[in-house]
Regions:
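Conserved functional hotspot residues or short segments at active or partner-binding sites
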Residues: 93-197
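A general structural motif
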Residues: 63-75, 117-123
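Structural motif
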Residues: 31-32, 89-90, 114
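Short amphipathic alpha-helical coiled-coil/interface segments
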Residues: 198-202
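Conserved anion/nucleotide-ligand pocket segment
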Residues: 2-71
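Oxyanion-binding "anion nests"
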Residues: 70-110
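Intrinsically disordered, low-complexity boundary segments flanking structured domains
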Residues: 17-24, 76-79, 102-106, 122-126
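Short gly/pro-enriched beta-turn/loop segments at secondary-structure junctions
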Residues: 26, 82-87, 131-133
Length: 203
């Protein structure tokens, strides 16, 4: 889906991406990069001292930005990712989900840096507006340990395991990876094994 064959979470600055594309694609632009003072690659945004500016109306804090690559990947399906609530991308739900059941299932997966709790909510906009949704809320317990894309994969696999075709798995193919990923979810392959296959392709 992206404009270049790079990992979703590439950890490169805009200047590094510009240099990469300029070289790899033979663009030949006369780039001038102004280096930032005091910048450290390992620093989180809230450690920079800069004021947070919402990159999107539905991404209002750092936890939402951290969870977005995984939770946003399953947004195209028939569930709410919390748009129309105060905490988009920190929760998911649908009228057909059993929140306590899904929370138990996800917590048994021992997801790095995340704990999952059941909740109910009614979105004021977007999917399921005004409907009561059962679902789960993601609490970030260790942001350095969170693997957001794997989280999205684990959530998709758990939804398919628990609810089968009630969950529109086909709708997430474009954002979750590939048809092969969906086939492996349907076959019951462990999500960590599927994600390991992605890592092999990054080299």
């Amino acid at each position: 889906m992206g404009g270049a064959p790079i990992p979703l979470l590439h950890a490169m600055t805009v200047a590094e991406l510009a240099r990469l594309f300029n070289t790899e694609r033979g663009i030949g632009a006369d780039l001038e990069v102004v280096a930032m003072r005091g910048w450290r690659r390992e620093a989180w945004f809230d450690q920079t001292g800069l004021r947070w500016v919402d990159p999107s109306p539905n991404m209002r804090n750092l936890h939402q930005a951290l969870l977005y690559p995984g939770i946003g990947a399953i947004e195209g399906s028939n569930l709410s990712v919390g748009r129309g609530t105060d905490t988009p991308f920190e929760q998911i739900g649908a009228p057909w989900i059993d929140g306590p059941e899904l929370a138990r299932e996800l917590n048994t997966r021992r997801l790095p840096g995340v704990r999952v709790y059941p909740l109910r909510f009614s979105p004021t906009s977007s999917r399921f507006v005004g409907e009561l949704c059962d679902g789960v809320f993601f609490i970030v317990t260790d942001r350095d340990a969170v693997r957001p894309v794997r989280l999205g994969l684990e959530v998709a696999a758990a939804l398919y395991r628990l609810y089968g075709d009630q969950f529109d798995l086909d709708a997430v193919a474009r954002l979750l990876g590939s048809r092969d990923t969906l086939a492996r979810i349907r076959a019951g392959d462990p999500p960590w094994e599927i994600a390991a296959g992605w890592a092999e392709g990054e080299a």
